[in-house]
Amino acid sequence: MGLFGKDRGERIAEFPCYLLETGTHLVPLPGILYNLVIERTYGERILGQFRGIGEAVDGALTGAGEAAEVPGRVAEVMKAFQERYDSGDKTQAVYICLVTEAAAGRHIGCIARLTGARAEGGELSVLLRGLVRAVVGQPVPSRRNEMWNGSVTVLDDAQRVATWGARQLDFARQGVFGAFEELDAGIGTFTARFKSSQKRGADGAAHLLTLSPLANTLFFHFSRSSFERSWKILRTMMHGFRDAKKDIRTAMDMLSVADLTVGLLPTTTAQRLEFLQAEDPAARIKTFVRHMQQLLEVFGSLYRATEYVHDRFETHGPIAKSQLIANQLRSLRFYIDDIKRNKPESGPGGRSRRLLPRPASGNSAAAGEEDDSEDSELVAIKRYVDEIEVKGVHADGVKMLKKDYRSLSKMHVQSTEYQMLRNYFDFIMGIPFGIYVSTPEIDLVASSRKLDNDHYGLVQVKKRLLEYLCVLKLSANSPGVTADAGAIEDGSATKRAVVYENKAQEQRKTKVPFLLLVGPPGVGKTSVAKSVADVLGRRFQRISLGGIHNEAEIRGHRRTYVGAMAGMIVNALCKAGCMNPLILLDEIDKVLSVPAGAGASRLNGDPGAALLEVLDPEQNHTFTDHYVGFPVDLSQVLFFCTANDLSGMSEPLVDRMEVIHIEGYTYEEKIAIGRHFLLPKQIRLNSFDMTGINLSLTDDAWRTVVVDYTREAGVRNLDRQLGAIVRGKIVEYVENNMSGSGDDVVTQKNLPKFLGLPPHSLREEVTQTTSFAEKYGVVHGLSYNSDGTGGVLVFEVIRSGDSRDKRLTVQTTGNLGTVLSESVSIATSLVKSLLARHVVHSSADDTSVAEFFRSECHLHVPFGAVPKDGPSAGAAISLALLSLALKRPVDPALCVTGEITLRGKILPVGGVKEKLLAAQLQGMGLALVPRGNRNDLVELAEDNAETQQRLLADPALPELATLQHKLGMAVHYCSDFRDLVLHAWPTADNLWHACEDSSVRPQL
């Protein structure tokens, strides 16, 4: 028959079972982490039955006596159960069915996975995580705390939920969600009222609430840090289900949330037992709703009782009031004495068996002092240290925090060291160890639609982000959220609990990519990161790295220094409240502006080098902040970085990230962004939508605003100018006594009224000629600026006379760099070679060429205050020198870019898209670019990958026609200097010789 019975397909024979002790009040539920503490010898005898099956068992039994070999049947049962109900982890595990009291003749329990165990002293701590409900068949041993192999029937909720109709699925979502929302509001109201009643200025009725033992018990439970963290996670999960689909997966998620909620809340043992024994999922949801309503009724009863006592209290005189208060104090003292006298419970044979967490044992003097302590914050630190091992903190951190707490408990409260250590613990308790916000179900269509709605264009960026979303959807193994038992049972956790982190679970975590968005200011790099955080359901944190010059800003200061604090990365985790947020490292190129070896770098460290560990997926799971002092796991943090220029960044840092270039927008794209995004935003921000007027701009007005009033790669200036137009319209509306409706169109003639006169157009400067200057020797080149934008440069060459030695000399000015000066030398040699070999000639006589060879020339590039460098001006300089030699002017609407060689080859250059955008804005009519940049032009012409491949395969160069229509100017390729000359003077006959004679043939 196999391991699973054929009648229901869920019965497992010979499954290890453990009958819980009656007085433990433990009701195991799926998804909850429990710590079982039993006598060591007895516990080792039980765990010895599973020796060799799981790493946790073998680790706990190290050094213990030999045990019998595990029966093959038990190992086979474990393997079969894992494959069917816990297949997410391939590591062999141990499972035990925790059995509770019998109800209606049936024993029901929860199958749990043994995740950790540790022996210390005479006790053994066993950590168990509930997985699924199960019904145990007869017979069941009569003695408690006994282990036996019995027949269990697994209650698989998925099989029953699969038979539900739409009405039941909707009830599952609405029932759990509605009950949770009401209870969440009720808990918030109760804690707020209780806190206000503790203040000195509260009225008498409010103070009476603190005298209720039930109110104090509830407030103590709700104010525990473990409960607050777990409840916050549940609240986040429930908010994610607000708009969830009415399907089977949502219903299963709601059942899991119900289990976690009942386990977290201070419900009674009878309520938890009733909830555990609800086999039918539909009945379980009804039970959940009823229990939540009962807890709300408890709050209402407390409020009504407080009001009743207050009304009766006011009718008594001062003596009666004093007697009532004295009775309260006397009862409290008697209760404290009883706690001190109580001994820990023992099972048969004097063996201590208990479930943790529970109050500290009465035979411990330190525990008694702690119970009587008035320092609630110190008690909170003690509780945190006791529970630190189940929070996923690194082993080094666990050891260090326990050592620091022992030191803290021995220090005087007034000492400086005490205050420093207290501040340190306050910060550590704020780090959200073990808290991961689960990624909601990924809808690729909705995600793509959101990215398109938030950003215009950016095709490559959206493509890469959708690839990452597909990986997440396929893997679907982001860290889950489970509540630990420290937030479930009453009392404080024990420092004996130790969790051995499962290595296989660590390996299943999806490695997140590190994306570096590079582009000019204002193109949407930061807003893209925000949109991705919304799509992934991750909390967003932004860290501005501009001006950071100290390594301690990243790694933190060592806490021995006065005023020490943690670094930006750990602080971002604290603000996010989880260990898997999306952190944006903004302007990462600015943090590396200090040259290597500079004084500041030596004194304060290199913050760029500190980022190497943060952005390395092989290292950041053990990132160490100097203030924290132990490794912090950053492996599930999604880092986005932005930069304007990569030239100042170190290669190792860039190599750790995937670089995505975001280019500047064309003016058509800017108009589309302004019309569909920016103008509606400004209308909304300035409340112009309340006027009922439909504001718009004409096409000519849009073009004028984009071309004349804003010269940038991004759209920030455009946003400001549109805001000025909207505010101007608001002034008109107010001056017209708040009257007006219908459409209001801003024309090109209206723009100076709102924006003033446009800045003087650079286009006029570069195209106009002077009356006394020669027209030849002037060529327009294209440049790529450090801010990611393009520009148009003017290369002017004039003949200032004959040189002294009758040889051609060229003087350069205009703040030219080394590479650009070398391009001038290369261009000079090339032109001299072509003219000397008569490859190019001007007329029948060569007087102009002869004059050129003995000339003293001067080459100048205007705007001398701006440094200029790079190889892409070689083609333009060569054409300018040839224009001077031949005395042939070049069309002022022509612009050139490309690196020139001594053989006349024109090599590809970078920033072609930005250069063409600049040429378009300056009104150029023809742009000549290297043939090697065809891929760049194809990407500029089309966004679709398939269309790009088709264009590249077409020898007719169809992308040039597309670009002419898109940019409004002609674009042509140039492979060598000959192509450049023929495009510059297309009407000149016989300007370039075919040169069949090898003695004069140019080596091209």
UniProtKB/Swiss-Prot annotation:
Coiled coil: none
Low complexity bias spans: 357-367
Keyword tags: ATP-binding, Hydrolase, Nucleotide-binding, Peroxisome, Protease, Serine protease
Main location: other
UniProt GO BP: protein import into peroxisome matrix; protein processing; protein quality control for misfolded or incompletely synthesized proteins; protein targeting to peroxisome
Active site (catalytic residues): 872, 915
Its EC number(s): 3.4.21.53
Residue ranges of the motif Microbody targeting signal: 1002-1004
One annotated Gene Ontology cellular component of this protein: peroxisomal matrix
Sequence ranges assigned to domain Lon proteolytic in this UniProt record: 773-987
Catalysed reactions, semicolon-separated: Hydrolysis of proteins in presence of ATP
Region (Disordered): 340-374
Domain Lon N-terminal span(s) in chain numbering: 15-296
Protein location: Peroxisome matrix
Database matches in PROSITE patterns: LON_N, LON_PROTEOLYTIC, LON_SER
Broad class of enzyme this protein falls into: hydrolase
GO function terms (MF aspect): ATP binding; ATP hydrolysis activity; ATP-dependent peptidase activity; serine-type endopeptidase activity
Amino acids binding ATP: 519-526
PANTHER family documented for this protein: ATP DEPENDENT LON PROTEASE FAMILY MEMBER
Function: ATP-dependent serine protease that mediates the selective degradation of misfolded and unassembled polypeptides in the peroxisomal matrix. Necessary for type 2 peroxisome targeting signal (PTS2)-containing protein processing and facilitates peroxisome matrix protein import.
UniProt record similarity statement: Belongs to the peptidase S16 family.
HAMAP family (UniProt xref): lonp2_euk
Protein name stated in the entry: Lon protease homolog 2, peroxisomal
